[in-house]
């Protein structure tokens, strides 16, 4: 969280991949603008609904909607009014509605924009998967032998 500018410097120095997502965005409006100017995405979790998170709502309002994503960060960061319970995908509409209310737009319109943005970043279920960037985080090319689940 305290390394926002450091990560931008690193990405600028080594070269950012085609798609950069700031997972569970926690920066302020100025940092949000910096990220968006580079064409990167800001993904907001349930924290944007928290009473004390005006800085996140300001960041949300500071960037073009084409740079926005939404996430659960499950099982953490459950949106208000369900804080204290495990987060899950079924609670995402609460986050989207709160985002839409803050932006002064219709939740369905924002949901459509978020869905479109998500497909641009990750592809969709009907298409071939979006290629992962090469490097240590690329998906394995051979199956991984996992131990069986259950008591040890």
Regions found by a protein language model. Name each.
Residues 20-22, 42-44, 68-72:
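Hydrophobic faces of well-ordered beta-strands that scaffold small-molecule active sites
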């Amino acid at each position: 969280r305290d390394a926002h500018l450091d990560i931008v410097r690193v990405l600028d120095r080594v070269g950012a991949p085609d798609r950069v997502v700031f997972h569970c965005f926690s920066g302020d409006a100025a940092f949000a603008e910096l990220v968006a100017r580079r064409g990167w995405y800001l993904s907001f979790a349930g924290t944007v609904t928290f009473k004390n998170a005006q800085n996140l709502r300001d960041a949300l309002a500071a960037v073009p909607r084409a740079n926005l994503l939404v996430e659960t960060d499950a099982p953490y960061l459950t949106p208000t009014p369900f804080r204290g319970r495990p987060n899950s995908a079924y609670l995402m509409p609460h986050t989207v509605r709160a985002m839409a209310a803050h932006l002064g737009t219709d939740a369905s319109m924002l949901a459509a924009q978020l869905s479109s943005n998500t497909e641009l970043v990750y592809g969709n279920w009907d298409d071939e998967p979006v290629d992962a960037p090469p490097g240590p985080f690329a998906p394995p090319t051979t199956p991984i032998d996992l131990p069986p689940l259950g008591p040890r």
